[in-house]
Amino acid sequence: MRALIQRVLEAKVEVDGQTTGEIKKGLLVFLGIGRDDTLATGQKLIDKILKYRIFDDEQGKMGWNVSQANGGILLVSQFTLMAQTQKGLRPDFGPAMPPSDAKALYEQLVEYTRSQFENVQTGIFAADMKVHLINDGPVTFNLEVEA
């Protein structure tokens, strides 16, 4: 499972012109679910994201996690993160979990994230989403947990 996390000043997701999720300061999390991923894999990754210290503390160093920074989380499914890109000129999405299975796992991970953190917003699984953000820094990290 892979997550591309971005520290943002604000972010929102729109589907068909309607806002489905919106946060002010916090983390925009793009989540890619692999063929062999499980709920346990996802929980491990979510736990890491929640504890990952990429917000400035009182000394101006990356010492605070999203909770300590009083931020929110915008969680967006993105199967393209699982693409194999080493060969050729077209991404291979074979490593991504099939959509029907991925949707169920994504929904479980949203529920888990909400059980661990109060301010969680989401996109809509498999929808054509428009993501608006103001990246803070920019600060962007690619996190991965093996199944």
Curated annotation (Swiss-Prot):
Gene: dtd
Keyword tRNA-binding: yes
Protein name, per record: D-aminoacyl-tRNA deacylase
Family classification: Belongs to the DTD family.
An annotated Gene Ontology molecular function: Ser(Gly)-tRNA(Ala) hydrolase activity
Localisation: Cytoplasm
InterPro entries reported in the protein's UniProt record: Daa-tRNA_deacyls_DTD (IPR003732), DTD-like_sf (IPR023509)
Subunit structure: Homodimer.
A GO CC annotation given for this chain: cytoplasm
Matching HAMAP family: Deacylase_Dtd
Enzyme Commission designation: 3.1.1.96
Reaction equation(s) it catalyzes: glycyl-tRNA(Ala) + H2O = tRNA(Ala) + glycine + H(+); a D-aminoacyl-tRNA + H2O = a tRNA + a D-alpha-amino acid + H(+)
Domains (record comment): A Gly-cisPro motif from one monomer fits into the active site of the other monomer to allow specific chiral rejection of L-amino acids.
UniProt GO BP: D-amino acid catabolic process
Function: An aminoacyl-tRNA editing enzyme that deacylates mischarged D-aminoacyl-tRNAs. Also deacylates mischarged glycyl-tRNA(Ala), protecting cells against glycine mischarging by AlaRS. Acts via tRNA-based rather than protein-based catalysis; rejects L-amino acids rather than detecting D-amino acids in the active site. By recycling D-aminoacyl-tRNA to D-amino acids and free tRNA molecules, this enzyme counteracts the toxicity associated with the formation of D-aminoacyl-tRNA entities in vivo and helps enforce protein L-homochirality.
